């Protein structure tokens, strides 16, 4: 049995401190833009619709869990992802294909025996996880 992951508390503390600074900057920038523009209901609708595909993809069950697992392990095989997350093979296969199709992960097949399939984050996938971490930690804080 492996020891529990100890980076979580220290990492959370560091991320939360940096996140507070980033949030202030984003809030300031956002408010500056909003003050300069009059947003119509159509503008608002168009903005939300332009992000709908990303909302649907990233907030589906298992998507962020898979990406988070990959950032912690760098490269990882199908079986290890399945065991780590407790997801069934069919669902995991579908999610991995979807994440690969949208450019978040790569799939590398190494000829065997045994045949080995490993997954890794692309730059887009890594950046997405790094951007999601503050949201995840902030949302899970008590």
Outline where the language-model segments fall:
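N-terminal leader segment of winged-helix/HTH proteins
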Residues: 1-55
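A short, conserved structural fragment
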Residues: 100-110
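Basic, amphipathic "hinge/linker" alpha-helix immediately C-terminal to the N-terminal HTH DNA-binding motif
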Residues: 113-132
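Residues within the helices of the helix-turn-helix
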Residues: 78-79, 97, 117
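Alpha-helical linker/hinge and terminal dimerization helices associated
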Residues: 68, 102, 131-142
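Conserved beta-strand edge residues that scaffold enzyme active sites
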Residues: 69, 112-113
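N-terminal helix-turn-helix DNA-binding core of bacterial DNA-binding proteins
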Residues: 41-91
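Basic amphipathic alpha-helical segments that dock to polyanions
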Residues: 70, 92, 96-102
């Amino acid at each position: 049995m492996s020891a529990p992951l100890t980076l979580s508390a220290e990492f959370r503390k560091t991320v939360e401190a940096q996140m507070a600074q980033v949030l202030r900057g984003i809030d300031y920038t956002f408010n500056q833009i909003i003050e300069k523009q009059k947003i119509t209901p159509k503008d608002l609708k168009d903005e939300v619709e332009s992000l709908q595909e990303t909302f649907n993809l990233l907030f589906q069950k298992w998507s962020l869990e898979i990406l988070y697992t990959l950032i912690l392990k760098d490269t990882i095989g199908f079986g290890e992802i399945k065991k780590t997350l407790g997801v069934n093979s069919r669902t995991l296969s579908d999610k991995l294909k979807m994440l690969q199709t949208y450019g978040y992960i790569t799939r590398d097949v190494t000829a065997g025996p045994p045949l080995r399939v490993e997954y890794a984050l692309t730059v887009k996938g890594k950046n997405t996880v790094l951007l999601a971490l503050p949201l995840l930690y902030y949302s899970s804080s008590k």
